[in-house]
From Swiss-Prot:
Name of the protein described by the UniProt record: DNA replication complex GINS protein PSF3
Pfam families: PSF3_N, Sld5
Record-linked PANTHER family: DNA REPLICATION COMPLEX GINS PROTEIN PSF3 (PTHR22768:SF0)
GO cellular component: chromatin; GINS complex
Main location as per UniProt: nucleus
Function: The GINS complex plays an essential role in the initiation of DNA replication.
UniProt family annotation: Belongs to the GINS3/PSF3 family.
Species: Debaryomyces hansenii (strain ATCC 36239 / CBS 767 / BCRC 21394 / JCM 1990 / NBRC 0083 / IGC 2968) (Yeast)
UniProt keyword annotation of Nucleus present: yes
Protein biosynthesis recorded as keyword: no
Organism lineage: Eukaryota, Fungi, Dikarya, Ascomycota, Saccharomycotina
UniProt record, GO biological process: mitotic DNA replication initiation
InterPro entries recorded: GINS_A (IPR021151), GINS_bundle-like_dom_sf (IPR036224), GINS_Psf3 (IPR010492), GINS_Psf3_sf (IPR038437), PSF3_N (IPR055221)
Cell location: Nucleus
Alphabetical UniProt keywords: DNA replication, Nucleus
Length: 176
């Protein structure tokens, strides 16, 4: 998946740390673990930003080898507990506390690994949560459930704002 250079949410999601494991010993990269001047040993587990981890995971060590510099591990935001919680009750999930750019990073991860199941789960969650977002944005006169609003990730916050603004404009248009 290509990144959008001008999208701040895309830049922030590329900076999210992903768990990785080095397949070889690399001299001089000890600073990644807090050991400047040292090597990073084979089988070292470390978290790297997605933009770097993605490149190191696809770059092969040599033309003869199929092995890459690192292997990516499944991140916490898509572990089985989170996915099961989403399947159980997507509306009550606090996406913001899990990951502020949950949809962006899920999209990137699913694209990297062709993870159809993740795409389906996230799309179903978006449908369920969008219905609630629309309800809150449409009912300006009702007291807003702040807990739900605070649980929205950045994409959902934009969706809430657009929906709310659209509803205000429609009410204004109907009034005039």
């Amino acid at each position: 998946m290509t990144s959008n250079y001008f999208d701040l949410d895309d830049i922030l999601s590329d900076g999210e740390k992903i768990p990785c494991r080095f397949n070889i010993t690399v001299p001089g990269l000890g600073y990644l673990e807090g050991n400047p001047g040292k090597s990073i040993a084979k089988d070292t587990k470390i978290e790297l930003p997605l933009w770097l981890a993605e490149i190191l995971a696809i770059c092969e060590l040599s033309e003869d080898s199929q092995q890459s510099f690192i292997d990516l591990s499944q991140p916490d935001f898509i572990n089985y507990k989170v996915i099961n919680a989403i399947k159980t009750n997507a509306v009550n999930i606090d996406l913001h506390s899990i990951l502020t750019n949950y949809y962006k990073l899920s999209e990137k991860w699913a694209s990297m690994f062709n993870d159809v199941e993740l795409i389906e789960v996230v799309m179903q969650m978006l449908k369920e949560r969008s219905f609630e977002i629309n309800n809150y944005a449409s009912n300006a006169s009702k007291q807003i459930n702040n807990n739900f609003i605070f649980s929205l990730d950045e994409f959902e916050k934009k969706l809430f704002k657009v929906t709310s603004d659209s509803n205000k404009q429609m009410r204004k248009w109907l009034k005039d």
